[in-house]
Amino acid sequence: MEIMIKSESNKFKKDLYILYPGDYFATKEDCMMGTVVGTSVAVCIYDPPRKIGGMVLFVVPGTMGTEGIITDEIARRGILSMEYLMGELVKIGGDRHFIRAKIFGAGYSNTGITNSSAIAESNIRFIHEYFTLEKIHVERSDMGGDFRRKIYFEPREGTVYR
């Protein structure tokens, strides 16, 4: 996937890829990835033995029903986003059995957006259900609340800075 912005001049002294909603990126390269999340969800995944990782930024665009993510029409965007990232990681040598995750975002907005807290809750529910179904260990979760988060991810080490 082509990344919107690549910065070579930053405090990390390595390439920094900035992701926007809908972007995903997986790499073996010694670099950083960054984004800002509000209602959207940033998922950072990495394969520690192979020192590769990736990030995706998406939002489940509505309130999910009670039938679970496999049959929920609204959850399809989240599933598609996650599978794009997982596929990219596997293409460059990742092994799903070793993948670990860190998840951020799904905050709600006090800006008058209708159903903001319900959408945030749907995003939280979606991502937890996805990782449970995929049997992927979530090492860190910082979700919900009424604030934004700035995330920097080092994909080779799986380190996240806020």
For the regions a protein language model found, what residue spans apply to each?
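Basic, amphipathic N-terminal segments that precede the first structured/catalytic domain
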Residues: 1-29
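A generic local secondary-structure boundary/capping motif
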Residues: 22-23, 29-34, 43-45, 91, ...
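Amphipathic alpha-helical interface surfaces
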Residues: 78-85, 99, 123, 127
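Short glycine-rich phosphate-binding loop at a beta-alpha junction
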Residues: 97-105
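Phosphate/ribose-phosphate-bearing ligand recognition and processing surfaces
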Residues: 108-120
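Divalent-metal-activated hydrolytic enzyme cores
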Residues: 118-162
